[in-house]
Amino acid sequence: MLLLRWKRFWFLSLGILLFSGVVSLMLFNLSESISFFYLPSDVARVVASNREIKVGGIIKAIKKSKDGVRFLLSDGAAEIEVLYEGILPSLVQDGINVVVVARFEGGLLLAKRVLVKHDERYYPPEDFIKSVRGE
């Protein structure tokens, strides 16, 4: 009888240990794949130089220059200037929500990618811009 209790105890303990190990591995892998983005008002206090981050906000004042495209990214509380060397997606214009993957250097975000934020519904480009602006 005592031997049966010890076997049951060790079997249950091993099961709990195995289950907690699997759950721990799942949570660890999930935490690596989740990607958050910062708001422009958070960038200055949380970002170290030369570290790649994601920053989300609303585009304001797009200007084309010889070194790329410059625009302001705003969250309503703060604005930060972004430099993107490349061709912007066709949906990018003033008032559109975007997420940029960039490095922060000297008060300027050097963008590697610009992603347009949208929901799961498909809109032709003209209708998308109208829906974002509330027309």
From Swiss-Prot:
UniProt keyword Transmembrane helix present: yes
SUPFAM superfamilies assigned to the protein according to its UniProt record, in alphabetical order: Heme chaperone CcmE
Signal peptide segment: none
Major location category of this protein: membrane
Subcellular location: Cell inner membrane
Example of a GO cellular component annotation carried by this entry: plasma membrane
UniProt-recorded Gene Ontology molecular function terms: heme binding; metal ion binding
Pfam families: CcmE
GO biological process, one term: cytochrome complex assembly
This protein's UniProt keywords: Cell inner membrane, Cell membrane, Cytochrome c-type biogenesis, Heme, Iron, Membrane, Metal-binding, Signal-anchor, Transmembrane, Transmembrane helix
Binding site for heme: 118, 122
Periplasmic compartment segments: 30-135
Residues in the Cytoplasmic compartment per record: 1-8
InterPro entries named in the record: CcmE, CcmE-like_sf, NA-bd_OB-fold
Function: Heme chaperone required for the biogenesis of c-type cytochromes. Transiently binds heme delivered by CcmC and transfers the heme to apo-cytochromes in a process facilitated by CcmF and CcmH.
Family indicated by similarity: Belongs to the CcmE/CycJ family.
Name of the protein described by the UniProt record: Cytochrome c-type biogenesis protein CcmE
Species for this entry: Neorickettsia sennetsu (strain ATCC VR-367 / Miyayama)
Originating gene: ccmE
